[in-house]
Regions:
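Tubulin/FtsZ superfamily GTPase core signature
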Residues: 1-136
Length: 136
């Protein structure tokens, strides 16, 4: 069993500049399933897995990465990609502590992106990672 230390984040009450209805619904899901899933892809491996879900119709998908070059390789609409710019585009260099530092520094922006894409009406969130590098 993997012991994950997921901290509680103090997220300030900032709303992204969105229309109320868009904020409530987020991106329209096209999967046709009984439940509405949202997918988070972290790092290069997680981003590729998230992209596969996007291609299956799970449009409430966001790929995060600290390496801009890895995000550029993903065939996702730009609004579904989030560059965690903390190291000048060079990524976390397979160092998980640097990845953690980057995500903590950008936690509010990450939260806003998730809220923009996911909206408020989701049933489950899948988090996909490769776990071999610094961001996943």
């Amino acid at each position: 069993m993997i012991d994950l230390d997921i901290p509680d984040l103090d997220i300030e009450d900032l709303d992204p500049d969105l229309e109320d209805q868009t904020q409530k619904n987020g991106v329209e899901d096209e999967s046709g399933g009984a439940l509405t899933y949202a997918v988070i892809g972290s790092g290069q491996g997680g981003g590729k897995i998230a992209k596969a879900f996007y291609d299956l119709g799970y449009k409430k998908t966001v790929a995060f990465n600290t390496a801009q070059s890895d995000l550029a390789l993903l065939d996702l609409p730009d609004e579904h990609k989030f560059f965690v710019d903390h190291f000048g585009g060079q990524g976390a260099g397979k160092n998980q502590e640097r990845g953690k530092e980057a995500y903590e520094a950008k936690s509010q922006e990450i939260f806003n992106k998730l809220r923009e894409i996911f909206g408020e009406n989701i049933d489950r969130i899948l988090i996909t990672v490769g776990a071999a590098g610094g961001t996943g």
